[in-house]
Amino acid sequence: MPTKGHSKGLAGKSGEFVFGNDLRIARLGFGAMRLTGKGIWGEPADRAEALRVVRRAVELGINFIDTADAYGPNVSEEIVAEALHPYPAGLVIATKGGFERPGPDRWVENGRPEHLKSACEGSLRRLKLDRIDLYQLHRIDPKVPAEDQLGALKDLQAQGKIKHIGLSEVNVRQIRDAQSIVPIVSVQNRYSVSDRAYEDVLEYCEQQGLGFIPWFPLAAGQLAGTRSTVSSMAAQLKATPSQVALAWLLARSPVILPIPGTASVKHLEENVASADLAINEDIMQALGEMARAS
């Protein structure tokens, strides 16, 4: 649920959110998917820079890092641990399981309980954790009964290996069904200023006090173009289109927790600066009209 507390650092200006009444984070987090090679596969082009990015994120006040075993695979989790372990107090690390990676840009759902339990064990080992703060089902595998997949996470939670459970790329019905099996604290769906297909999911998260984590929050490249509404707003605010897009997300709902990712310290610093960018009602209205027209 959103709170009125104050996190430290520039990222703290984004406001706060609490998962499950006990995990307090700054709303602007960091997504670690880009700390890998092309196709979200293998090592990053510059591992030293990737390590610098993660460390700089924490210096800027970010205390919520989202990763997954599928990123690399395994590479992203390993870089997070190498950069930050032993972890600073208050850092919340979220990861995900439920995919297999046969190659670059290839993703295959695997929700078999034995796979999910093995995936969680691997993440614990790579991240050097005794317990994962937020473990998310990366996708609901249509080949496996959802209750079996969620039951595996419930078992892991009962064993003390994960603290809280989240979902990814789900609709409202799937969230409700999951909540009948195990407590859910977050949903991670694709969402941005230019992609709002999951408005109903966002509204449900607001009603339930669930964190809504938009992946692809900058809609990679869709914000470009000097004639676009976002670029026009950015020029008025003396900001970048990406900063406007992130500031819009933060203003859109107190349960939205953006996790922009990058492998560049420069881009990271630009993204975090969005926490201090004020979006007025006129700009919110203009961006809303842009969405309705698209």
Each predicted region: which residue ranges?
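N-terminal binding-site loop/beta-alpha segment at the start of enzyme catalytic domains
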Residues: M1-L91
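Beta/alpha (TIM)-barrel catalytic core signal, keyed to glycine-rich beta->alpha loops juxtaposed to Asp/Glu
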Residues: T3-A11, E16, I140-S294
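Acidic (Asp/Glu)-rich catalytic clusters
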Residues: G20, A81-V92, R125-K128, Q179-I181, ...
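N-terminal small/glycine-rich loop or linker at the start of catalytic domains
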Residues: N21-W41, A94-W107, R131, Q136, ...
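Conserved beta-strand positions
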Residues: F30, T67, T95, L134-L137, ...
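Alpha-helix N-cap and loop-to-helix initiation/capping positions
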Residues: G42-E49, V75, I79, W107-H115, ...
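Short, acidic/polar
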Residues: E43-A57, G111-L127, N171-R176
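Active-site groove signature of glycoside hydrolases
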Residues: L124-K143
